[in-house]
A protein has these predicted regions:
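Short beta-strand scaffold segments in enzyme catalytic cores
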Residues: 30-34, 374-375
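Short glycine-rich loop/turn motifs
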Residues: 29-31, 40, 206-208
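Conserved Nudix-box catalytic region and its N-terminal flanking loop in Nudix hydrolases
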Residues: 35-74
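Short helix-loop capping/hinge motifs at secondary-structure junctions, enriched
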Residues: 40, 115-120, 264-265
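Acidic, metal-coordinating catalytic segment for phosphate/diphosphate chemistry
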Residues: 1-31
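Active-site neighborhoods and metal-handling regions in enzymes and metal-associated proteins
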Residues: 153-384
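Unchanged
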Residues: 59-84, 89-149
Length: 384
């Protein structure tokens, strides 16, 4: 038995622990933390006024993952879903499903549900999709701790894949030189992303969008993107936008890189071309303004209007082909919501979102982009 960042919850003599693995025959339960379209999927029992995460007992001879799938289908009516194993949990102490109080083990899973049948074949009365977790839990000393573990694992996963993108940009900065083809830069970036842990690329299977010179003002969907035959010049401007993923966990990271006299200039203050320098300084200013302006209550639309006004006030234009400035990070590409007009959702209602202003001076042939992923914790806005 291997310890997995052991965490405990005590109260009424209950203790919750987490492990990476245990012997398979010890696993008697499966619990499936579930979401659908960004909402928590909670079950209400016919005989209770409380809510619970779907889950249940393993049947004789049943594979534990099949237990998870079966319980999910029976208790939520899920018919189309993606499910993944997270870790093993255990509960020690007497409770409604463990009369002797000995340590019992279960598999903790996560499921993204895409379609429900509308029928429940179990003791559940109904399924409720919630923006916020319930206050009236059926198992208040157990399931909130399982949710907390899921969120911790999720954050680690997103941080790791985003770090892969950051390391790839740092790597490519060291080897970019005049004479390199954009296609070769794309190939090197994508190979590095895979080497560092990505298993695929979430945006139309393109891992690295690479633009140079007057192409840096181009804003195009990945569906139409084709890497040009441009070659890096002795003095050049290059924008690289990365979209790695592992499983269905996304990274999203972009930077505009300046080459002067054949060398990458990493310090904005040392850039000699004043237009390029001003463009990158404005990107820094925009991200600083993001921290100043937003709260969890800020809507995507409010951020859209504020930042577009801020861009214009500072003498720039927004180049994005859709006019937006970023999007939520989700597990299904079609579920993204955008920093755009009409989006009344609050930033605090999504787990993560990108901020990626693509800007230029009016009528200039050069564009600039800086993209990070952000989220809120108890202290406020944080860069992932």
């Amino acid at each position: 038995m291997n310890s997995y960042q052991k965490g405990k919850e005590k109260g009424d003599m209950l203790e919750v622990n987490f492990y990476d693995t245990v012997d398979d025959d010890l696993l008697k339960f499966a619990v499936i933390i579930s979401q659908s379209n960004g909402k928590w999927v909670m079950c209400k029992h016919k005989e209770r006024d409380t809510y619970e995460v779907p889950g249940g007992h393993r049947e004789e001879g049943e594979d534990i993952l099949e237990t998870a799938k079966r319980e999910l289908q029976e208790e939520t009516g899920a018919v189309k879903f993606d499910i993944e194993q997270l870790c093993v949990y255990s509960v020690t102490g007497k409770n409604s499903i463990n009369e002797n109080g000995e340590e019992t083990f279960g598999l903790l899973c996560f499921a993204e549900i895409r379609e429900f049948s509308g029928e429940l074949h179990c003791e559940m009365e109904k399924v409720v999709l919630m923006d916020e977790l319930p206050e009236n839990w059926t198992y208040p000393l157990i399931q909130p701790k399982l949710i907390e573990k899921y969120l911790q694992i999720q954050k680690q996963s997103y941080s790791q894949i985003q770090q892969t993108a950051k390391q790839t940009i740092a790597y490519i900065k060291k080897i970019i030189k005049p004479g390199m083809k954009l296609f070769d830069i794309r190939k090197l970036c994508e190979e590095k992303l895979l080497e560092l842990g990505a298993d695929s690329f979430w945006y139309w299977d393109v891992g690295a969008f690479v633009f140079a010179g007057d192409e840096t003002t181009v804003s195009v969907s990945g569906k139409q993107y084709v890497t040009s035959d441009k070659i890096i010049e002795n003095n050049d401007i290059i924008t690289i936008d990365l979209s790695p993923q592992v499983g269905n966990i996304w990274g999203d990271y972009a930077r505009t890189i300046i080459v002067e006299n054949g060398e990458v200039v990493d310090d904005i203050e040392l850039i000699q071309n004043q237009e390029w320098k001003s463009g990158l300084q404005m990107e820094e200013k925009l991200h600083a303004e993001l921290f100043r302006f937003v709260t969890k209550e800020t809507t995507f639309e409010e951020l859209y209007y504020h930042m577009n006004e801020f861009i214009v006030e500072n003498g720039f234009v927004n180049l994005d082909f859709m006019g937006n400035l970023g999007h939520s990070i989700v597990k299904v590409k079609g579920d993204r919501i955008y920093i755009e007009k009409g989006n009344k959702a609050k930033l605090g209602e999504v787990n993560y979102f990108t901020f990626e202003p693509h800007i230029a001076f009016p009528d200039s042939k050069y564009g600039y982009k800086k993209e990070n992923i952000y989220y809120f914790d108890e202290t406020g806005l944080v860069e992932l």
